[in-house]
Amino acid sequence: MSSFEEYFSKHASEYAKSKSHKSGEDLKSLLTIVNPESSWKVLDMATGTGFTAMAIAPFVSEVIGLDATEEMLSNAVMLSEKSGLRNVKFIKGRVEHSGLEGGSFDLVTCRRAAHHFPDKTAFVVESKRVLKDGGLFALIDMVRPEKDKDNVRNRLEILRDSSHVDAPTVKFWSDLLSKNGFREVETISTKERIAFPDFLSPVNVDSEEGKACLDYLKSISRESLVNADIDPDDLSIIKERVIFLYRKVE
């Protein structure tokens, strides 16, 4: 079992109860800027427990939620059945090679997951492949501050969650999408300061991972902390999430 499968299998039930994943401001913003249409067929990549797929479902014809972890999919199916939605289907697959028919989706979404992907280029290329010409691609994820030259934020995330690979900068994503057949429609950034224990969630402060994160932050300079948008005194963290809305170039 890979590190991300092990992590999400362990924490699937916590994600299924996460208010932030179910109804976060980034999800509300996504629905607003995408403005889904009733005829659309939608693919939600790395759907997790299915909150993004289920939020979009009432506005479109069909949604497929794809994920690589059985436990996350089981929770997604359970939650969708409770909601009474009949146009959502969850399937197991990888974002780099979904196995789905090319040119078949009006919208591809991916929310709070891309920092787990080891091959981000393959993910973007696969997203383009399954989209119809002119289709929309909506990516929402955390990003690293441009000034964080010591890569503190990614090092911290890996200590908290071994399945974390890399949360790159805004420029990285915009360049990658532009080079692979997408044109920018809109990019929206949201920032919030969160307390250290909330940053760790669903990991506990007293856990081995929580203690490792705290020890790491105490070991680095104030300047490095500030550049990583971490308060040197209370260790609260400014978390930036960005919505990248791009269109597949015909």
What role is predicted for each listed range?
Residues M1-W40, F51-A55, E71-N75, L79-S83, A138-D161, ...:
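Conserved class I S-adenosyl-L-methionine
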Residues L43-H97:
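Class I SAM-dependent methyltransferase SAM/SAH-binding core
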Residues T49, K120, E184-E250:
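Conserved Class I S-adenosyl-L-methionine
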Residues T109:
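A conserved beta-strand element that flanks and buttresses the S-adenosyl-L-methionine
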Residues R112-A113:
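Short catalytic micro-motifs in class I SAM-dependent methyltransferases
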Residues T121-L136:
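A short glycine-rich, Lys/Arg-flanked "PGG" loop and its adjoining helix->strand segment in the class I
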Residues D166-G181:
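Short alpha-helix
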